[in-house]
Design a protein with these regions (language model features):
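Small-residue-biased structural context
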Residues: 1-220
């Protein structure tokens, strides 16, 4: 099994066949990290401080953007690739159906946080808690039941091809932001595992361009 054993994830413990899910798991951990940052910022930020409001808004918009890219890649590329390979398994298809349905549950919660930020700050803690509960539950479900299907259905080469399709769809701008976002503030071991999964030219771009550009914007 080639998947790195990243802290806080379930898929590495459950096993994923030949597929290297390092990047997928790093994104999941980044969502968990930013949910914690979101709750902390909402509880402590001074709404009368424009700079603080702007930094919290920048972090929140980035979280939403990365979540949209992540779920779009799953719904439009990963799950459709898996479905015909797993058509013989009612259980597998029911898991994929559940993954898509859970994505639909998350979108209204993102909108609710937006509304609370803008016009109902007294509701902010509750809606952030609802988002965190739903999203972390979805991530755990996906790691437990969804991601192992990738190793069942796809070879390592086929999984890499799916990754290239996602990269083409996202483009260099979104892809560079995604890697800088995933590596932001994570521990040394996890950063090394995630960074090491990149081809050498992209590692150089990350150090020279992507990370410095990402760090220019205050967040949270």
């Amino acid at each position: 099994m080639t998947t790195q054993k990243l802290p806080g994830t379930d898929a590495a413990r459950h096993g994923t066949g030949a597929a290297d899910l390092t990047i997928m798991l790093a994104a999941h951990d980044a969502f968990r990290r930013d949910l914690t940052r979101l709750a902390r910022a909402a509880a402590t930020a001074d709404p009368s401080d424009p700079a603080r409001r702007q930094s919290v808004a920048a972090g929140w918009e980035l979280l939403k953007r990365q979540l949209h890219l992540h779920h779009t890649a799953e719904d439009q590329i990963i799950w459709p690739v898996l479905r015909p390979r797993l058509a013989h398994s009612e259980h597998a298809l029911s898991v994929l159906d559940a993954m898509e349905a859970e994505h639909d549950l998350i979108d209204p919660l993102l909108a609710a946080v937006d509304t609370a930020f803008n016009v109902a700050p007294d509701q902010l803690a509750d809606v952030i808690d609802a988002l965190a509960t739903t999203l972390t539950g979805h991530l755990a479900h996906e790691e437990r039941d969804g991601l192992p299907l990738i190793g069942v259905a796809l070879t390592a080469a086929e999984w890499r091809a799916a990754g290239r399709a996602i990269a083409r769809k996202n483009g260099l701008s979104d892809g560079s932001e995604m890697f800088a976002w995933m590596l932001d503030g994570i521990g040394r071991d996890q950063a090394a595992a995630t960074h090491g999964s990149l081809p050498p030219p992209l590692r150089l771009l990350y150090r020279a361009i992507w990370k410095p550009r990402f760090d220019k914007t205050p967040r949270w």
